[in-house]
From Swiss-Prot:
Oligomer status and interactors: Binds, as a tetramer, through its N-terminal region, with the bZIP domain of CREB1. 'Arg-314' in the bZIP domain of CREB1 is essential for this interaction. Interaction, via its C-terminal, with TAF4, enhances recruitment of TAF4 to CREB1. Interacts with SIK2. Interacts with 14-3-3 proteins, YWHAB and YWHAG. Interacts (probably when phosphorylated at Ser-171) with YWHAE. Interacts with calmodulin-dependent catalytic subunit PPP3CA/calcineurin A. Interaction with COP1 mediates nuclear export and degradation of CRTC2.
Phosphothreonine PTM positions: 169, 192, 501
Localization, UniProt: Cytoplasm; Nucleus
Its job: Transcriptional coactivator for CREB1 which activates transcription through both consensus and variant cAMP response element (CRE) sites. Acts as a coactivator, in the SIK/TORC signaling pathway, being active when dephosphorylated and acts independently of CREB1 'Ser-133' phosphorylation. Enhances the interaction of CREB1 with TAF4. Regulates gluconeogenesis as a component of the LKB1/AMPK/TORC2 signaling pathway. Regulates the expression of specific genes such as the steroidogenic gene, StAR. Potent coactivator of PPARGC1A and inducer of mitochondrial biogenesis in muscle cells.
Source taxonomy: Eukaryota, Metazoa, Chordata, Craniata, Vertebrata
Region Disordered: start-end pairs: 1-30, 174-195, 280-306, 335-491, 513-543
Residue numbers of N-acetylalanine PTMs: 2
Gene for this chain: Crtc2
Residues spanned by motif Nuclear export signal: 271-287
Family: Belongs to the TORC family.
Gene Ontology MF annotations: cAMP response element binding protein binding; chromatin binding; transcription coactivator activity
Protein name, per record: CREB-regulated transcription coactivator 2
């Protein structure tokens, strides 16, 4: 081209004279130019293809982790070129958080991407569903410069010899596991302030890249000096986890009885998962002395000290000497039911013999208190002592102090089955017993027909720690009067020769009340047992005893046995009674007794709300029935006794019945928290009622 330009005028004249030569020159020129352009394009294609191949190799190497799992492999991404690494800066890196954040650099590179199709800048970071800036610790810039692309094969070995804290799989639980289980040689300093964050990567590489990363090692030494004592304490406790795993506001304080050298948080929680494993934490047991002073009313019901719980609760509730019950009522037997010797006295007690022989009926209170749940005594304590008869004698059937802890069902201790009306571990609401005081003989056969309706035998002995009780010591009784100490299940009449099987769950004797229709019978003779039968309307078909016992376990279980020529007083109210109750009947088949079932069904609406016992006197009574008891009952709220009933000795059932509760009574009885504030006030209140 330059030569033709230099010989321009001469060639022009020659071409004019020789046009063929000129055209040949033009053709040669074009051919040469075409060859040059072809060679140039060839060179450019070679260059472009090599560039593309190199970039493809790089992308394939760095993208291999993305194709394998959803999370990038931190090892391989962290060792690429600087241009691949710059978007990986964590925003925690305070010096570079604005300049080198991934989003900012992506915005700067977008125009350059569109300019040339050959310059494909790496878009592989976008393919990860998570932003890698939050998945990997911030790489130190000096460490990145130490690993150029050319040195990668030499340093592959070091990558795979990194400590276990960097060898993570693609899951969040692996991140937690690797952070929670650092190797002993890894000096991972935990969450440090952002100014010393670059040294975290140095902690992982400590001991393996000593020659290459001296500055990082100095940072580590400074870090160890920077850790003040409170830092060390914080690192040893629950804060030694990455910032993403920190649980705010949970402070685990060691208890005083825990040894000081036991770490509160174990160093290794290696079961995996995104949440820390709390199974190795040794939480101290609850304090033996409760912090709240009111909690002493309800002591721990879980040991062998259930009898002390009972006495403690009773003393708190003011059940002490001054109940106004008359001179012969033995209050200490009620106050500490196991320790007092009056409970150990047997049927040969002179008071009991006197009650057998005297024509005047006496109330023989056989108090065999189980270890009552504290909640049952805490609300209404001892409702049955409101009869106020002056000849109440508390020497009970001798109660042995063996707490039945293994096989005792909810109502383990009381040998009186009337006090086990609901026997399902899920239900704990005690059915109300509107106790019949059957004056005169009743039809035991009709009650015997209704008695085989079963208890629901679904009681489990696991509730024995809730209500541990005092079984009846039947060794001193005659064999025809013994009761199984753990009676429940189908309630049939007591077979008098039944041996005292301690863990019998088959035979439920009905309310063996020692009812003797004639006053002079010896105690060895077989008595007529007062029986309890359900009213038959409970919705459970053949299991009318299967009643909800939701709120309270069995309360104060007492039995007042009244023995007189023709009357028998059967009193066994649970302290908390909700639901239908039981009507007792006694004696042989005579006397119209059909009315008290209807009377009970009329009273059921009261008994569902009230928690006091409904006492119904049924049957014809002899004039020898105690007028003192009638007068005392007339003073108790909820009973109406007519004057003719008092004159006749409470002759008919209609004379003494429970009036429907008013709205005030319902609210007062249905509120389980309506405790009187002072035990002395409650004591005086009960004494006033009984006078």
């Amino acid at each position: 081209m330059a030569t033709s330009g230099a010989n321009g005028p001469g060639s022009a004249t020659a071409s004019a004279s020789n046009p063929r030569k000129f055209s040949e020159k033009i053709a040669l020129q074009k051919q040469r130019q075409a060859e040059e352009t072809a060679a140039f394009e060839e060179v450019m294609m070679d260059i472009g293809s090599t560039r593309l191949q190199a970039q493809k190799l790089r992308l394939a190497y760095t993208r291999s982790s993305h194709y394998g799992g959803s999370l990038p492999n931190v090892n391989q991404i962290g060792c690429g070129l600087a241009e691949f690494q710059s978007p990986l800066h964590s925003p925690l890196d305070s010096s570079r958080s604005t300049r080198h954040h991934g989003l900012v650099e992506r915005v700067q590179r977008d125009p350059r991407r569109m300019v040339s199709p050959l310059r494909r800048y790496p878009r592989h970071i976008d393919s990860s569903p998570y932003s890698p800036a939050y998945l990997s610790p911030p790489p130190e810039s000096g460490w990145r410069r130490m690993m150029p692309w050319g040195n990668l094969p030499a340093e592959k070995g070091q990558l795979f010899r990194l400590p276990s804290a960097l060898n993570r799989t693609s899951s969040d639980s692996a991140l937690h596991t690797s952070v929670m289980n650092p190797n002993p040689q890894d000096t991972y300093p935990g969450p440090t302030p952002p100014s010393v964050l670059p040294s975290r990567r140095g902690g992982f590489l400590d001991g393996e890249m000593d020659a290459k990363v001296p500055a990082i090692e100095e940072n580590l030494v400074d870090d160890k000096h920077l850790l003040k004592p409170w830092d060390a304490k914080k690192l040893s406790s629950s804060s030694s986890r990455p910032r993403s795993c920190e649980v705010p506001g949970i402070n685990i304080f060691p208890s005083p009885d825990q040894p000081a050298n036991v770490p509160v948080l174990p160093p290794a929680m290696s079961t995996g998962g995104s949440l820390p494993d709390l199974t190795n934490l040794h939480f101290p047991p609850p304090l033996p002395t409760p912090l709240d002073p009111e909690e002493t009313v309800y002591p721990s019901l879980s040991g062998g000290n259930s009898t002390t719980n009972l006495t403690h609760t009773m003393t708190h509730l003011g059940i002490s000497g001054g109940l106004g019950l008359g001179p012969s009522y033995d209050v200490p037997g009620l106050h500490s039911p196991l320790s007092h010797p009056s409970l150990q006295s047997s049927l040969s007690n002179p008071n009991l013999q006197a009650s057998l022989s005297s024509p005047q009926p006496q109330l023989q209170g056989s108090h065999s208190h189980p270890s009552l749940p504290a909640s049952s005594l805490a609300h209404h304590a001892l409702p049955t002592t409101s009869l106020g008869h002056p000849s109440l004698s508390a020497p009970a059937l001798s109660s042995s102090s063996s707490s039945s802890s293994t096989s005792s069902p909810v109502l383990s201790a009381p040998p009186y089955p009337a006090s086990t009306p609901g026997a399902s571990p899920r239900h704990r609401r005690v059915p109300l017993s509107p106790l019949s005081l059957p004056a005169g003989p009743a039809d035991a056969r009709r009650s015997q027909q209704q008695l085989p309706k079963q208890f629901s035998p679904t009681m489990s002995p696991t509730l024995s720690s809730i209500t541990q009780g005092v079984p009846l010591d039947t060794s001193k009784l005659p064999t025809d009067q013994r009761l199984p100490p753990y009676p429940y299940s189908p309630p049939s009449l007591v077979i008098p020769s039944h041996p005292p099987t301690p863990k019998s769950l088959q035979q439920l004797p009905s309310q063996a009340c020692l009812v003797q229709p004639s006053g002079g019978q010896p105690p060895g003779r077989q008595p007529h047992y007062g029986t309890l039968y359900p009213p038959g309307s409970s919705g459970h078909g053949q299991q009318p005893y299967h009643r909800p016992i939701n709120d309270f376990s069995l309360g104060n279980l007492e039995q007042f046995n009244m023995e007189s020529p023709s009357t028998s007083l059967v009193l066994d109210p649970p302290a908390f009674s909700e639901g239908p109750g039981f009507l007792g009947s006694e004696g042989s088949v005579s006397g119209p007794q059909d009315s008290h079932v209807l009377n009970h069904q009329n009273l059921t609406h009261c008994s569902r709300h009230g928690s006091g016992p409904n006492i119904i006197l049924t049957g014809d009574s002899s004039p020898g029935f105690s007028k003192e008891i009638a007068a005392a009952l007339a003073g108790v709220p909820g009973f109406e006794v007519s004057a003719s009933g008092l004159e006749l000795g409470l002759g008919l059932e209609d004379e003494l019945r429970m009036e429907p509760l008013g709205l005030e009574g319902l609210t007062m009885l249905s509120d389980p928290c309506a405790l009187l504030p002072d035990p002395a006030v409650e004591d005086s209140f009960r004494s006033d009622r009984l006078q």
